């Protein structure tokens, strides 16, 4: 797997997809900007470093629990020629705000999204039914305010579920408030679950790669706490709660992709 990792190419791919996301906004699509950009690097390493072969018939499972970040997932599908821009545009012909993933719209979507906090439970079901496959789940840190997340974690721990990899996009902000001081992400607390706990810089491609590689080899489930920045890549967007629901002017957006 390591021979497939080219740090320079991965960094360039992140930059490329980040610009493609901004261009979608310029074209009239409206998405949750901050939370999409915070997890972009995590997904680029996952899908472009041979960890997750999304086009494979016998692939693992991926659940984007924070479904409001679906834009980057769709951009990856388009980039891999698994989704056409025309189909994306048709699906969003009214170009309403946001959107969610739907298993009936794509064979590459493994679970519907919408209400937060439920994908871990779904992941448990998939893991039990598919014990030889890895279940990758990307969750937002704000989802840990949902009791269903903790119930799922306790179940994974108590029943020694072995094949789930949970990636926490720890951007320290929900849609409306800061969750920077929450102590639930302290490794000491999570270690009580007796799972493999790792903490990384969620924008350092090399660190992400090494972490994923380690988790792939583990014989028990893992939790990755990825410290990220909401709106990563553009200073005007970074850690700005306004852009959880608002979109900058076209002039500002165009200035970002010059």
Q: Where do the model's predicted regions map?
A:
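N-terminal capping segment at the start of a domain
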Residues: 13-30, 169-170
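Generic beta-sheet signal
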Residues: 60-62, 133-137, 164, 218-228
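Thiamine diphosphate
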Residues: 108-216
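Glycine/aspartate-rich loop-and-adjacent alpha/beta segment that forms the canonical ThDP
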Residues: 205-258
């Amino acid at each position: 797997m390591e021979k497939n990792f080219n740090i320079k190419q991965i960094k360039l791919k992140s930059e490329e997809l980040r610009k493609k996301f901004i261009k979608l906004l310029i074209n009239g699509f409206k998405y949750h900007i901050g939370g999409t950009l915070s997890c972009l690097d995590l997904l680029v390493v996952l899908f472009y470093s041979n960890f997750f072969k999304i086009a494979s018939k016998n692939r693992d499972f991926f659940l984007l629990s924070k479904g409001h970040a679906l834009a980057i997932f769709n951009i990856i599908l388009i980039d891999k020629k698994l989704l056409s821009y025309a189909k994306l545009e048709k699906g969003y012909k009214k170009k309403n705000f946001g959107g969610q993933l739907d298993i009936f719209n794509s064979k590459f979507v493994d679970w519907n999204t919408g209400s937060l906090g439920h994908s871990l439970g779904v992941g448990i079901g998939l893991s039990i039914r598919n014990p030889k496959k890895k279940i990758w789940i990307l969750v937002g840190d704000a989802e840990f305010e949902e009791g269903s997340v903790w119930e799922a974690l306790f179940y994974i721990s108590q029943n020694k579920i072995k094949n789930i990899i949970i990636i926490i996009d720890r951007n320290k902000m929900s849609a409306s408030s800061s969750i920077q001081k929450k102590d639930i992400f302290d490794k000491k607390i999570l270690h009580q679950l007796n799972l493999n706990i790792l903490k990384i810089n969620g924008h350092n491609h090399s660190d992400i790669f090494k972490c994923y590689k380690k988790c792939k080899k583990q014989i028990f489930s893992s939790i990755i706490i990825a410290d990220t920045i909401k709106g990563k890549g553009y200073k005007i967007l970074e850690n700005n709660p306004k852009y959880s629901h608002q979109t900058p002017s076209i002039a500002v957006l165009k200035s970002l992709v010059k």
